[in-house]
Amino acid sequence: MWKNKDIYFFLKKKALLFQRKNKAKTYFILDEDELNRGIFNILGYFALSTKVLHLPEELSKNQRKKIDGLYKSVSEISTFLIGQIAKNDYNKSKITGDEILKYACYYILQASSIIGGRIVLVELVNNSKLIDFYNKNDFILLPNKTENEEKLL
């Protein structure tokens, strides 16, 4: 189902542990047509959590205020973290990445309406295809000194 070893490892070793310890919640998107026939078929999944984002020093005061919504001098901010998001390799044509991201954002909006919060964070490896995907979905790349990992809001 999951060709990517990192995805498989997360689902097999971490998802349930994070769920039990209330560190993150993992949501599976199921094929409703097959579920109605008694077949449990996962189309994709996403994991949500919270994380404190330490803002890069390079950000201007205006950029900081835009992110925080109130203050120019903020150095960190609480965020909703989309920690994992993936499609089942055997059902790629049944759901798009955009659809999975919309499901994740729906749950984040529900949480935000209850407890507040305004920033959604995605951490990912420096991969132009992934960065383009999130940019297309209105995420903004933060400047980052680390070459291997990028942060998008």
Q: Where are the regions that the model predicts?
A:
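Glycine-rich phosphate-binding loop
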Residues: 93-99
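Non-catalytic substrate-recognition and accessory regions of acyl/acetyltransferase enzymes
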Residues: 1-93, 106-121, 125, 129-153
